[in-house]
């Protein structure tokens, strides 16, 4: 019986070859597209290097600010300032770690009278390297002491290091970021752009620049985002509750403004 089914199928395939090939190619293309979508969603949602802690991470990608006593509808949406990030999120005691991360920006990475490349750079702090797990090919991440002191040091991706030096073994050497000298503390394997909260090609301490002074609206608004690492997902409610308490305390210290997060921290960056 099964043999008869195969014979009938082959007969119909030979009888209409054009329809057969269209059907086969259409089915293959549909399966391929579904596989691509599934893999893309997996890469963006499940724990994978360097975002190995997605399942216990919370994010604040933006916030809102309004005049004190005003309605939520009469507000502006923006990134947070370094000051807001420090007082409202870096002060969390229920979290394992909190990092502030700027949006990626284009930067000129160069050697004096040598090679140069344009790369995506983010400004962050030492906690970034605790929350995200990178594979270091040379050197190491900048430390808390480097971050606190504003030391001009940088971590490069492998692609940038190779473009400049021809190798990834460059820890301790110096590069220029927009013509400002930075010491290379380490080199990491390249990161996919799908790792939206960790992606960059150059990472530096935000304390080594003037980004903290780029703030307005009573210094509440700036260019930073926050990533919060919980000890477990069960701590999410406690973290959100403490974040709300810190928000109210912060608002009490402001003269004319109030900040609010529109449902954040949440689990999507």
Predicted regions and their residues:
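Generic structural signal for small/hydrophobic residues in well-ordered secondary structure
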Residues: 13-16, 23, 44, 58-62, ...
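Short, strongly hydrophobic transmembrane alpha-helices
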Residues: 15-45
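Short amphipathic beta-strand/extended segments in non-transmembrane regions
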Residues: 61-62, 78-141, 256-262
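Coil residues (strongly favoring Ser/Thr
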Residues: 74-75, 147, 253
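Mid-to-C-terminal secondary-structure elements
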Residues: 125-141, 152-269
């Amino acid at each position: 019986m099964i043999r008869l089914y195969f014979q009938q199928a082959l007969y119909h395939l030979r009888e209409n070859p054009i329809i057969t090939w269209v059907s086969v190619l259409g089915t293959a293309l549909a399966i391929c597209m579904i596989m691509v979508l599934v893999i893309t969603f997996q890469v963006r949602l499940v724990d994978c290097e360097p975002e190995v802690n997605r399942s216990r991470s919370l994010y604040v990608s933006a916030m809102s600010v309004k005049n004190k006593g005003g309605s939520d509808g009469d507000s502006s949406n923006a990134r947070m300032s370094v000051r807001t990030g420090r007082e409202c999120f870096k002060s969390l005691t229920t979290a394992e770690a909190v990092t502030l991360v700027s949006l990626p920006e284009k930067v000129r990475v160069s050697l004096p009278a040598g090679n140069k490349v344009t790369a995506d750079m983010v400004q962050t702090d030492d906690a970034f390297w605790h929350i995200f797990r990178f594979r270091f090919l040379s050197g190491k991440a900048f430390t808390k002491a480097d971050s606190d002191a504003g030391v001009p040091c940088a971590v490069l991706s492998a692609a940038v290091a190779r473009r400049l030096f021809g190798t990834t073994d460059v820890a301790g050497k110096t590069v220029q970021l927009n013509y400002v000298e930075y010491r290379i503390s380490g080199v990491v394997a390249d990161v996919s752009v799908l790792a939206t909260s960790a992606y960059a090609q150059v990472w530096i301490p935000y304390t080594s620049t003037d980004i903290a002074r780029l703030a307005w609206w009573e210094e509440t608004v700036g260019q930073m985002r926050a990533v919060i690492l919980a000890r477990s997902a069960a701590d999410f409610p406690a973290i959100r509750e403490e974040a709300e308490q810190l928000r109210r305390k912060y608002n009490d210290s402001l003269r004319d403004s109030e900040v609010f997060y529109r449902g954040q921290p949440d689990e999507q960056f």
